[in-house]
């Protein structure tokens, strides 16, 4: 899903870090998950430099996944009540991410369908390739009239042009 919406692995690392400092109740309906972690904490957790951290925050904002909720003094801070519910907070607002949950689930389902379709097509291509090779070989063994040697060579060239799939 991340690649489909233009995110890179480092964007995901930062989102994951944001998520790790939230609490389950932050994600309940009607609540706003806000992260007020310092730049130093975020840099320590991600291994980013300050410039890299700022770049990925900007990318997440541009992707519509987070908003900045600025305090009057420009600092990030927050407080929770005795139940752990955010009472007041300024920082990275993850509400856009939460609001797009259904969209991401639908996109994930669509991508899974596409992967399954591609897997099915690869399997069909493999079976068809084996059938063609077997028929050409059988024709050669049976000494049937026709350009079977030429077809065998053309088929080998065609197979060489097919993209190789990595097994990793």
Show where each model-derived region lies.
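Amphipathic alpha-helical coiled-coil segments
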Residues: 111-128, 132
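Electrostatic interaction modules used in gene-expression and signaling proteins
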Residues: 133-168
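A short, conserved structural fragment
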Residues: 62-71
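Short, amphipathic alpha-helical interaction segments positioned at domain boundaries
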Residues: 83-117
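A short alpha-helical element within helix-turn-helix/winged-helix DNA-binding domains
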Residues: 30-47, 60
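Short, Lys/Arg-rich nucleic-acid/phosphate-binding segment
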Residues: 71-79
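Short recognition helix of helix-turn-helix/winged-helix DNA-binding domains
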Residues: 1-32, 145
